[in-house]
């Protein structure tokens, strides 16, 4: 190839690169969005410690293991552990184990009990070297210490980096908890956060095995119903990105669900690592600037499968059935 041809080839290559840069290459904003999406995909709710053994202690002793705030309305009663801010004690007041009215139905229990079944909410961050609240964090009660309809409870925790975390928890007259998670930044740094929620169950319950009745992990994602049996999740995990919906664990008569904040994209995961887990994490970060604040809402429904109640939530809370 002579010198003229070499120069022509180089010129043509340069022209192609320039044209691509002008018309096809992603803009700085698009690159930032792509990086954020990549970060979100690599972020996930906190890993369960697969080496953690289920400690065979009584439910009563497990309840006593941490300080608690009590909650009660016309349908449910129980408590929230201040260690982790976990909903792990829930009893149905109007349903009993036997026809003679003995022993109210207990659904949620602490993780140290063999039949542990509980709900956690919180934050993860793509920012390194930041202390975050976790399942062992001891939350402080600010003000009112009993949760009831029209009587919220505020929990707070501060790290040593100038970041203050809050959970403002409300309950309605039936089965709905609303958790507003807030973070205030008193430092001179900025951080990215992703809100998450997860339902964890130590063991699968006794299954009815009635072919038209699903018991296991369940969700509706962008109007698509997903049902996964306990045995199926042991063999293969499930993951799906969505912009609307809910997820949870369902029994024959009871259901525990998480509802991510409306109009926020999230990824849902069902998995088993010594425990069953249904969780979601928002896939777009909230940036917490210096002297700023951010918030995210998670709704939790822990309910008896009463048709009227479920229909009411579906209609008034925009929850897909």
Question: What are the residue ranges of the model-derived segments?
Answer:
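Aromatic/His-enriched, Gly/Pro-containing loop or helix-boundary segments
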Residues: 1, 40, 142-144
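Juxtamembrane extramembrane loops of integral membrane proteins
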Residues: 13, 24-107
